[in-house]
């Protein structure tokens, strides 16, 4: 081929290449995922009252934020990702019911990601997915989107998570809040406010709280008992509250806790359980005093105070 022929061929190809570049054909990577935004981008959103930037869609940003829930970076995970998602879900209601359902499915699945591990960074995805699910459950109370079947699945998944989570760390000086027990409690408190929450559910949740406190293998020191007490207070405030079942649950807890004094010195697991239960019951009293008084709540207070006097 002569030099002129080479030039002719190149000139013939050039317009096509330029067209692909500007139109956004495969050569320019239009179908490739958009690059992740840096923290400066997310800080700007938080600083501007959580407004969605121009040329961005809330759900696409939510999917990116969701991928950061497992980050060991406390600013990215907590201050930015969780905080932005919570505002967009509850206060600003940026997402359609279909999008909320999709987030619910993703975050519920995350509760099982690495379950059984302890002391690893896998905890962040599980714990902060539970916290984000609590925002969805709060949104559900204001504008229902889950439906009964999804609600039942979420409640079951939450109880399983509280039962199976082995990593109960509350806080890390470098990586920030971990708080798996507190976040699961926040989710249960929102779910316990639902009209779909039944009397058998009340019993299941109370038993899950007892089990969590008994199996923690430490005395909680980052407010976990307060968050679990809130679940008890929410349950006790329901119009269909099963007072008899509550009193049976409390008596069973109290009897189990008295076992601690059978050994001298007390065995550590029994002592940890005793302390966790005692702190939680004191927090229940505090929570109930902040709520409008009802005959049922007064009975709960009397029963809890009676149990505390025996400690």
Name every feature range the model reports, one short phrase each.
Residues 103-112, 116-239:
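Eukaryote-skewed repeat-based solenoidal scaffolds used as protein-protein interaction platforms
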Residues 12-24:
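Bacterial N-terminal signal peptides
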Residues 2-15:
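Bacterial N-terminal signal peptides that target proteins for export
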Residues 64, 79-83, 128, 157, ...:
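Alpha-solenoid helical repeat scaffolds
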Residues 235-236, 241, 253-311:
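A cross-kingdom marker for long, charged
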């Amino acid at each position: 081929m002569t030099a002129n022929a080479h030039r002719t061929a190149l000139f013939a190809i050039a317009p096509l290449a330029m067209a692909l570049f500007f139109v956004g054909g495969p050569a320019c990577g239009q179908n490739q995922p958009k690059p992740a935004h840096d923290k400066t981008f997310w800080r700007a959103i938080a600083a501007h009252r959580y407004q969605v930037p121009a040329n961005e869609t809330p759900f696409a940003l939510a999917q990116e934020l969701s991928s950061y829930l497992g980050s060991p970076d406390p600013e990215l995970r907590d201050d930015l990702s969780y905080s932005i998602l919570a505002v967009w879900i509850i206060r600003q209601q940026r997402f359609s019911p279909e999008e909320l359902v999709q987030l619910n499915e993703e975050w519920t699945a995350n509760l099982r990601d690495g379950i059984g591990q302890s002391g690893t960074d896998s905890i962040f995805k599980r714990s902060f997915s539970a916290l984000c699910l609590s925002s969805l459950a709060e949104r559900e109370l204001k504008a229902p989107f889950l439906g009964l079947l999804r609600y039942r699945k979420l409640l079951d998944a939450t109880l399983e998570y509280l039962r199976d989570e082995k990593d109960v760390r509350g806080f890390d000086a470098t990586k920030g809040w971990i708080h798996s027990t507190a976040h699961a409690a926040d989710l249960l408190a929102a779910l316990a406010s639902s009209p779909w929450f039944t009397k058998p559910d009340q019993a299941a949740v109370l038993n899950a709280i007892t089990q969590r406190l008994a199996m923690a293998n430490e005395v909680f020191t980052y407010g976990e008992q307060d968050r679990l007490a809130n679940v008890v207070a929410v349950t006790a405030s329901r119009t269909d509250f099963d007072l008899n079942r509550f009193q049976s649950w409390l008596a069973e807890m109290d009897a189990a806790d008295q076992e601690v004094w059978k050994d001298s010195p007390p065995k550590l697991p029994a002592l940890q359980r005793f302390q966790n239960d005692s702190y939680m019951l004191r927090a229940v009293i505090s929570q109930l005093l902040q709520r409008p008084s009802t005959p049922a709540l007064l009975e709960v207070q009397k029963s809890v105070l009676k149990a505390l006097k025996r400690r």
